[in-house]
Amino acid sequence: INIGYIASYCKKRFGLKVEITLFKYHEELEEAILESPPDILGLSNYCWCQNLSQEMFKVFSEKNPNGLRIWGGPNFPLDIPSQTKFFKDFRYFDIYVPIDGEVGFSNIVEKSLTVNDTNIRNTVLKDSIDGCVVRNLDGKLLYTFDSTRIKNLDEIPSPYLTGLLDKFFDDKLVPMLQTNRGCPFSCSFCTDGRDAVNQVNRFSKVRVKEEMDYIATHVKKNVHSLFISDLNFGMIPGDIETCNVITDIQKKYGGYPLKILSTTGKNKKEQVIESIKSLHGSLALSMSVQSLDENVLKNIKRDNISADQMLALAPTIKESNLDTTAEIIVGLPSETYDSHLDTIRKLIDAKLDDVIIYTCMLLPGSEMATPEEQSKWKFQTKYRILPMDYAKLHSGKNICETEKVVVGSKDLSFDDYVALRMIAFTLWMTNRGLLYSALLKFLRELQVDVAGLFFQMVERRDDAPEVIKNVYESFKQATIDELYDSPEEILAKIQDDKFYQDIINEKTALNVIRYHHAVVLSKCMDEWTSYALTIARDLIQENGILNKKTEQQFSDIENYCKGRSHNPLGKDRMLTNPEFVFHYDIEKWLSDPTDTLLLENCKMNKPIIEKFVLTDGQFHLIDDNINFFGNSAVGYTKALKLVPSHMFWRKPISKVSGSTQINDHTEWLEYTQLV
């Protein structure tokens, strides 16, 4: 959508004087350059396309030496010395457009239109250009400091409504919507933490409504998701109206979007809750705390964001029937192994549905990536291949993208980093929404430390079933093996066609957590559940509270978790519907809005048999994505990212009632209601 905005703004300013073609797929772009190179080539610079962009610039330079090469995006250093080094390291571009790109890029086009010579470089690169950093013909950098952000975003014509993005409504891409720009926070690890983008500007409600309607009428039937690229969705004035617009679209167009991917606001959580609760669970509430340690928060300039207020709202969130996702980062300044575990424990105690742990990336354009900050905290850094960001060019050259990550510091050893990654994987698998909600609630009811379950699953993994032990060992080794000393080492290694083929064949360069998640779901989900239940039972016993009553209660919890998690991805999954006898009404217990109902008060007069089934809607939603991305672990990795987690798990159906299948009233209800 970013290049769509730039194109629509240029078309508005220059009309028929310019011809603009947009590309998403590198194969099409390279072919177009080779067949008919343009006068100006503009490329985005994000962490997932930096090296590829440079290769495209090289191809372009060979075909049109007189053409202008324009780069733009957030992946650009903040300080002048690092910017100078950036221009030296990346030689195949002429002008950089930082921050918002519409004004800066259109200023380049305006200047280019005054040139009568076929060699536009000689004229355009002589002087500075507002909103740009220019490398002149002598290699000197020319700066301007004028503000180039557009405050009234409706001045930018919609790339959707003008038809510029129609070609991208294929069965591969997920549409993206932007309702506002800017971030009021100053987080040091983020490229949007700089003062230059502190002001939040927004598009009008009418514009957003028209774009949502356009997207819903053009999206392919097998695409069920929507990205909202706002940085604090739900927190900004007007977001409630946006959510109401989306809700109306969902009702009007059979449930689309089923899943919304976005980052919700970091403060004003009451307003965020009010905004997104109308979306029927299609958007989870993000608790992007990153850490709950006061020193860490101060060091990353997040002390103006109240984590305590976030956690205090947990009961309100539950009452609103919202999924919650907490995000934390391993390797932040002054973070220790113990402080990280404390953060995890507090988030688990707050009963958040998901706790997702990321490795700290040093992003060019963020304060934390500056040489001063890296030296201050004595970061130990390595480089990783970005998963699924690789390509083979027409020339036969292999290319991939890399990221710089923190794997240690003066406060965190490398061994600690690996251990925390193991815990991160365990949380990803075992603390995800509905799947083990009964088990976790039961442990809390017995006052057993829930975080201890996840920690002990890692600690006692040598006692796990062989297949689970192998998963853990594979995860640990992959976590170590994915690290390299330099990007040059990676880019040299990928030229080995055997190594490149290993990437294609899913043997390396994977998202380690998501890949192993897909492995477990597709190959050994039953064993994972059994292992988690074994550790939980041991913890209950170690606390001295395993007796005849709790044993029977735990048996029901055990069967419920096994039924829910059974065979989520197998081709025969619609035929393998496990049945269990239950003495307690687990569904009634779980659905108590006050969260005070005890399991012992849900004992039924007589046992019932419940069958655990998947609906046709669940089956087809997952199959739509798997059929597109491929029936492999990596294919599952991609597909599962676009499926709401509750859609994997089976639903219990009481055989006493005579109903052995779910009555699908409407596709909308089936797709959006929590199960």
Segments (PLM) and residue ranges:
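A general structural detector for well-ordered alpha-helical segments in enzyme core domains, enriched
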Residues: 6, 29, 52, 56-60, ...
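C-terminal accessory/interaction regions of large nucleic acid-associated machines
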Residues: 473-479, 491, 495-675
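Glycine-rich beta-alpha loop elements in corrinoid/cobalamin-binding modules
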Residues: 9, 17-146, 638
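C-terminal non-catalytic alpha-helical accessory regions
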Residues: 418-525, 531
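Radical SAM [4Fe-4S] cluster-binding motif and immediate context
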Residues: 151-319, 330
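Glycine- and acidic-residue-enriched helix-capping/strand-helix junction motifs
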Residues: 1-3
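A structural motif corresponding to the C-terminal lobe/cap of the Radical SAM core domain
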Residues: 38, 202-203, 249-457, 575-602, ...
